[in-house]
Amino acid sequence: MADAYEPYHVLQQSRRDKLRIPSLDSHFHFHPPPPPSSGGGGGVFPLADSDFLAAGGFHSNNNNNHISNPSYSNFMGFLGGPSSSSSTAVAVAGDHSFNAGLSSGDVLVFKPEPLSLSLSSHPRLAYDLVVPGVVNSGFCRSAGEANAAAVTIASRSSGPLGPFTGYASILKGSRFLKPAQMLLDEFCNVGRGIYTDKVIDDDDSSLLFDPTVENLCGVSDGGGGDNGKKKSKLISMLDEVYKRYKQYYEQLQAVMGSFECVAGLGHAAPYANLALKALSKHFKCLKNAITDQLQFSHNNKIQQQQQCGHPMNSENKTDSLRFGGSDSSRGLCSAGQRHGFPDHHAPVWRPHRGLPERAVTVLRAWLFDHFLHPYPTDTDKLMLAKQTGLSRNQVSNWFINARVRVWKPMVEEIHMLETRQSQRSSSSSWRDERTSTTVFPDNSNNNPSSSSAQQRPNNSSPPRRARNDDVHGTNNNNSYVNSGSGGGSAVGFSYGIGSSNVPVMNSSTNGGVSLTLGLHHQIGLPEPFPMTTAQRFGLDGGSGDGGGGYEGQNRQFGRDFIGGSNHQFLHDFVG
């Protein structure tokens, strides 16, 4: 017996022996120990987590022989309980250290074994084996019964259990196989799809094409408020998914091409193909999630519009662009009736109309801060581009349009207002100067301050002739008055008596106008004054008599000229 079972000196040999059931060639002779003092009923081995290895029998005639090994005594304390439904295989081994503590021969050794790591879902029939003839102490009464039990265990445990033979068959029947495969498929599946849904189509190249407007026409209608913002973000995410998938697909294709070019690496291409399938699966899951959210948002919007009483009518929507932004109402119920579409809510596949409101606010502030010179430098354009999130070309184009549409009309209006104001100020100053330089006549003064060079009709002064006759006391016909004002220029009047109607000379109409006196300068007279004019007025005689006559006549003429209809003439000329 000692030759058949060697002690364990090699770890691999120990592991192999634990998993192997040897053939039982020798007979076992079991002698029951004395019954315990408690006198309990028939108990069996506690088959929870231990393996019991039977080796040899007791070759002693004394049935009351007790085991003095403390380890065996401790083991015996577990005996006497009810039988369990599970057990492990029985192996035969020798334990010299245990045999040395006994008085005779081979002993029955019980060695615990670690928990089995088998994933088999089929319980081994040896687990439920109850050896007949087992008494309170758990030992067989006779060698024949023990031998029959060992043969039954060996027959029911048929099949190799080595590390390289039989594991596949055990794992296929394990109840943990399917959950483990599902977990692995969730994280690292490459397209098998045994326990998961079929989410990968036969043609994975469908993800390489951008989403068309027709595919998302039902969800691409602009909505106001948070609903429109959410849909805009989702569409942007969908576009980003397509772009990234294209990028990764091209990179993997390049890697596969490099594998095929190098000799000996042609077998690596299938792994890249599996990676492509996994990539397609993940990106398609993202695409389906985004499209489902878009569809849900679209349906939710339709329901809300129906509740508000505004049916959706996308055909009547017309884009209206205002300078630097968009006119759009943000109300949810009025989203179907508004005439503008928010620029920052526009779908990604449509051209943007205008710029976002935040960017336009920053650009307008800079324009009005630099109104006198609205031409930003390259540094200013880059700074504004960083602040607004726009490109440099967008900032430059906005300022070009702003200078044409906003700045230039404002400058022209300001210039027009300044021109009108200057014209009004110049006209008022000219009137003030005109008023200050014009001298009006005074009726209380003896000498007249102004007179007119207008011809008087011959039949318009019969009463003046009577007054002149009373003053001067003569019957001479006065036709002209020569007034020396000190300037050396002659002043002509058509002043005649209505009875005789003898005109002496007429005033010329081509003379200049004096701004000081308002008189016409007689430059081009037809003929010089006759020398007899002084004699007609009686001025060639005594100075006192002539002066008095001239003064009275001149005073009378001044009063007549200022009064009557000639007053209106002076008022019109000055005013």
UniProtKB/Swiss-Prot annotation:
Keyword Coiled coil: no
An example Gene Ontology molecular-function term: DNA-binding transcription factor activity
Domain notes: The SR/KY and BELL domains are responsive for the interaction between the TALE/BELL proteins and the TALE/KNOX proteins.
Region: Disordered, residue numbers: 24-43, 306-337, 418-485, 533-557
SMART domains listed in its UniProt record: HOX, POX
Chain ranges for the short sequence motif Bipartite nuclear localization signal as given in the UniProt record: 229-246
PROSITE patterns cross-referenced by the UniProt entry: HOMEOBOX_1, HOMEOBOX_2
Cell location: Nucleus
Organism: Arabidopsis thaliana
Pfam families assigned to the protein according to its UniProt record, in alphabetical order: Homeobox_KN (PF05920), POX (PF07526)
Family to which the UniProt record says this protein belongs: Belongs to the TALE/BELL homeobox family.
Bias (Low complexity) ranges: 419-429, 443-463, 473-483
DNA-binding region positions on the chain: 348-410
Keywords: DNA-binding, Homeobox, Nucleus, Transcription, Transcription regulation
Expressing tissues: Predominantly expressed in stems, inflorescences and flowers.
Gene Ontology biological process terms in this record: floral whorl morphogenesis; fruit development; internode patterning; maintenance of floral meristem identity; maintenance of inflorescence meristem identity; negative regulation of DNA-templated transcription; pattern specification process; plant organ formation
Protein's recorded name: BEL1-like homeodomain protein 9
Role of this protein: Transcription factor that is involved in the preservation of the spiral phyllotactic arrangement leading to a regular pattern of organ initiation. Required for maintenance of stem cell fate in the shoot apical meristem, and is essential for specifying floral primordia and establishing early internode patterning events during inflorescence development. Acts as a transcription repressor of AG expression in floral and inflorescence meristems. Is also responsive of the nuclear import of SHOOT MERISTEMLESS (STM).
One annotated Gene Ontology cellular component of this protein: cytosol
Residue span of region BELL domain: 223-294
Domain of life, per lineage: Eukaryota
Region span, SR/KY domain: 174-190
Classification via InterPro entries: HD, Homeodomain-like_sf, KN_HD, POX_dom, TALE_homeobox
Subunit structure and binding partners: May form heterodimeric complex with the TALE/KNOX proteins STM, KNAT1/BP and KNAT6. Interacts with KNATM, isoform KNATM-B.
Residue ranges, compositional bias (Gly residues): 539-551
